[in-house]
């Protein structure tokens, strides 16, 4: 048995190193090979590496530019204008993948229409003890309890400032940058942490995200309460408005899927009252839907991936209705196909994000979502993504 396991690991390594070399020189220089990644390379990586090590390797490979530029050409049909910017396509990488701003340019090369860095906390912090990430391959899902591990504002500012001129051009070309802000675990004044994030990283962002919905920092989700949220966002908006320069970042709030009806009404009310620029819906869920098969399904943390998809989409639908479609929404949670993306768009999202799908399907999933989304838009008689936004509410 030991010999068989050793031989299997050696074979996995050969696939990753040898197959990866072939991949770099041929497959991805064309259109990417969905089957090769989903059936061979990604499973081999998962057998060889624990989830966090695989994540770190992926960030490293992408940051070094080792993956060739995706060749899928975004059509005008996929372009969206929202949050004061043009988005070449509506598919972004969600916060949590590039926590420290190390792989922004490599992620654009994969075909994402926008990149969201973070969450970033004011001071560096380690997050929760390992292991803190768990795969549920049977469910196409992941549970994480990272706990806002972050290099801190100073380190991320240094990295992003070094490429600021490049980002200015990318944004002009329809590839905006978002930065997701968090609070330190030991901070007493949460608002002060977010305000500091706005002050330091605001000048480098096209949009900022106030993340008050991670389930892995004690007390964080309580900031979604009406009084606490109004107080926090008032200070964040005041700091944003005080930033120098003509182009100030949009401010969005990322909310949880595990909210009561009253919670949702309160968030919608505060967002409209204060003029929040957008909502990101949703973060991971602490619930465990019936039917999960993964052996690690009972691990503590936030669940992402396919089991989150419908809960996320329903929350988008409800928040779009509560805000009467006046506040742009970025939909995230279980997106791995064009159908998933379109369902969120028709429910009210202007843009979508993915992350967990990369774990199981690899980089070709980006082109797959865009290709399938474009085909579905044509099939259903939409001329653009914008035409499909919130259409479920007009039927």
From Swiss-Prot:
Substrate binds at residues 99, 144-148, 211-216, 283-284. It is found in: Mitochondrion inner membrane. Binds 1 FMN per subunit. InterPro entries: Aldolase_TIM, DHO_dehydrogenase, Dihydroorotate_DH_2, Dihydroorotate_DH_cat, Dihydroorotate_DH_CS. Pfam families: DHO_dh. Keywords: Flavoprotein, FMN, Membrane, Mitochondrion, Mitochondrion inner membrane, Oxidoreductase, Pyrimidine biosynthesis, Transit peptide, Transmembrane, Transmembrane helix. Coiled coil: none annotated. The keyword Membrane applies. The chain crosses the membrane at residues 11-30. The active site is at 214 (nucleophile). It is an enzyme of class 1 (oxidoreductase). It is a single-pass membrane protein. GO terms for cellular component: cytosol; mitochondrial inner membrane; mitochondrion; nucleoplasm. Its EC number is 1.3.5.2. Its cofactor is FMN. The keyword Flavoprotein applies. FMN binds at residues 95-99, 119, 180, 211, 254, 282, 305, 334, 355-356. The uncleaved transit peptide is required for mitochondrial targeting and proper membrane integration. It comes from the Eukaryota. Monomer. Catalyzes the conversion of dihydroorotate to orotate with quinone as electron acceptor. Required for UMP biosynthesis via de novo pathway. Belongs to the dihydroorotate dehydrogenase family. Type 2 subfamily. This is Dihydroorotate dehydrogenase (quinone), mitochondrial. The lineage of its organism: Eukaryota, Metazoa, Chordata, Craniata, Vertebrata.
